[in-house]
Curated annotation (Swiss-Prot):
<comment type="similarity">
    <text>Belongs to the UPF0125 (RnfH) family.</text>
</comment>
<feature type="compositionally biased region" description="Basic and acidic residues">
    <location>
        <begin position="94"/>
        <end position="110"/>
    </location>
</feature>
<protein>
    <recommendedName>
        <fullName>Protein RnfH</fullName>
    </recommendedName>
</protein>
<dbReference type="InterPro" id="IPR016155">
    <property type="entry name" value="Mopterin_synth/thiamin_S_b"/>
</dbReference>
<dbReference type="InterPro" id="IPR037021">
    <property type="entry name" value="RnfH_sf"/>
</dbReference>
<dbReference type="InterPro" id="IPR005346">
    <property type="entry name" value="RnfH"/>
</dbReference>
<dbReference type="Pfam" id="PF03658">
    <property type="entry name" value="Ub-RnfH"/>
</dbReference>
<feature type="region of interest" description="Disordered">
    <location>
        <begin position="86"/>
        <end position="110"/>
    </location>
</feature>
Length: 110
């Protein structure tokens, strides 16, 4: 059976794990993850919860791999992106209002 070269990666805020290895052609994403040993190294990975992708595109655990694929195991989001944007916009509005008040106050003194 032909062999394919793949990579598996798991990223953290400050660093990332990357492993390159060779598997049989037709190997599934799940089988590659299991064979890589990453689940033993990082016990926080749960294949029922963590999203999986190949080159930033979501895939199913049952999908077959191609030569050169990079399996990416995504960590769960710690914060809701919509909520973060909402808070940032509110803070910017508050900062703008304070700036306007400071400018008015400075103009009155002159």
């Amino acid at each position: 059976m032909a062999q394919i070269n793949i990579e598996i990666t798991y990223a953290f805020p400050e660093h990332y794990y990357l492993k390159k290895f060779t598997l049989d052609e037709g190997t599934t994403v799940q089988s590659a993850i299991l064979q890589s040993g990453i689940l033993q190294q990082f016990t926080d990975i749960d294949l029922r919860e963590n999203k999986i992708g190949i080159f930033s595109r979501p895939v199913k655990l049952t999908d077959s791999l191609n030569d050169g694929d990079r399996i990416e195991i995504y960590r769960p989001l710690l914060a809701d992106p919509k909520e973060i944007r909402r808070k940032r916009a509110a803070q910017q509005a508050k900062d703008q209002e304070e700036k306007k008040k400071a400018e008015k106050s400075a103009n009155k003194e002159n």
